[in-house]
Regions:
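Charged, low-complexity intrinsically disordered terminal segments
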Residues: 2, 6-405
């Protein structure tokens, strides 16, 4: 299994040299801390649920050897039913199919997979397991959940990002409206590391020993004109507990011109808040987009509380009004970006299993910037006047929520 960023966080741009760019600084930092940086990759952004599932299903249809899926949850709905039907067809063709989901994620889902569903899925030849099944006294299983979203097909194609398996990524939800999210399709050397993450978790949970060259095929060399540099930063609670937090903080510290963040549950840890404040002090433009509504009660209030603090320090805060923005992305200096599963809150950064791709490519970064600029048109800029209009109760709830996290 690959090593990612070590626990010890030592990062300074002071010695980086006057000519060093933010992307080169962060890339070197990730290398020094043990994150796998690969150079032979191609990335495609999947900006809607429709885009993700069309792309995913098409590539599953062409699978020849294996399909691996690791999700926080599979919601028992039309998308999951279509997916498992397709996977069952692939099993008949001789393709190995392994699927894993988080037991708590399933339990907290309003349409969970129940034992009868799992029995039916397994009867079709699909291997499917729960990560860390919930047993009495329950509370022992509340932390260290598997929040990753990873798919690997034939060891050649990989997916990660913010979307689980559910039809509301396409249809939205009555309470919050349209769902906005971000996923990526990867091909190239970085897929090997997604595969390593999946197989490590699978073998640990099942006691199996799946592995070998068939799961890590050689990748085709891409032309330099399209090859993209990617670091897969994986968080595991014991081995690399601060990996994603440090990668975010390092990226924010290294920024020289601009930082743009979109995150649905924005209650960042102190180290990330400090990095943002330091960036503002040195004149870096910081723009943060958070949803005005959420699928989790009280979350917007806690996010608004933190956002208001950062607004007073000079950050531009946008409240997205076009539904629920569940994307977990950051763009730095129009040169590199991250897309992944980690929320900027204590749950993701201190407890859960998470995976983010740091993509060192201006083209992909500016595609995300263009999306950000479109979404600004459907957002409200947080100002002192907007803040004053919030009720005292909402401000109090935000303060309590921030205190609890």
């Amino acid at each position: 299994r690959q090593m990612c960023i070590r626990d010890r966080f030592v990062f300074s741009i002071g010695n980086a040299g006057a000519q060093a760019t933010s992307d080169s600084i962060v890339m070197n930092y990730l290398k020094e801390m043990g994150a796998p940086v690969t150079y032979n990759n191609e990335v495609k952004l999947l900006m809607t649920g429709h885009d993700k599932f069309v792309d995913l299903f098409e590539n599953i249809r062409h699978a020849r050897h294996h399909i691996h899926l690791e999700y926080f949850n599979f919601r028992n709905d039309s998308i999951a039913n279509a997916l498992f039907s397709l996977l069952a067809e692939k099993v008949k063709e001789g393709v190995e199919v392994r699927a894993m989901f988080d037991a708590f994620g399933n339990w907290s889902n309003n349409q969970p997979l129940k034992e009868r569903h799992l029995k039916s899925i397994r009867a079709q030849g699909i291997e499917i397991v729960k990560f860390d099944p919930i047993t009495f006294p329950w509370v022992n299983h509340a932390i260290h959940r598997d929040h990753r979203k990873i798919v690997v097909i034939d060891g050649k194609i990989g997916y990660t990002g913010g979307m689980n398996i559910a039809d509301y990524y396409i249809n939205g939800l009555p309470k919050i409206g349209k769902w906005h999210d971000m996923h990526i399709h990867l091909e190239g050397d970085a897929v090997r590391y997604l595969q390593g993450i999946f197989l490590t978790m699978w073998n640990r949970e099942t006691g199996q020993h799946v592995g070998g060259p068939a799961y890590f095929p050689d990748t085709q060399q891409l032309p330099d004109s399209i090859a993209e540099e990617i670091a897969i930063v994986d968080r595991t609670p014991r081995e690399t507990p601060r990996s994603i937090s440090h990668a975010y903080a390092a990226s924010i510290q290294a920024a020289q011109k601009s930082i743009r963040i979109v995150n649905p549950y924005f209650v960042p840890t102190k180290s990330i808040r400090k990095a943002i404040k330091n960036a503002l002090k040195k004149g870096t433009e910081v723009e943060i987009m958070i949803p005005a509504v959420s699928d989790i009660a009280f979350t917007p209030d806690a996010s608004f509380y933190i956002a208001h603090k950062l607004m007073k320090k000079g950050a531009k805060i946008y409240l997205f009004n076009g539904g629920f923005h569940h994307s977990k992305i950051m763009m730095v200096d129009s040169t590199f970006c991250t897309v992944g599963t980690a929320n900027l809150n204590s749950r993701s950064l201190r407890y859960d299993y998470e995976t983010n791709a740091f993509i060192f490519d201006p083209k992909i970064t500016n595609e995300l910037n263009a999306m950000f600029e479109r979404d600004v048109q459907n957002s409200t800029l947080l100002t002192p006047e907007v803040w004053k209009k919030r009720s005292g109760w909402k401000k109090f709830v935000g303060w309590v929520g921030n205190l609890m996290t």
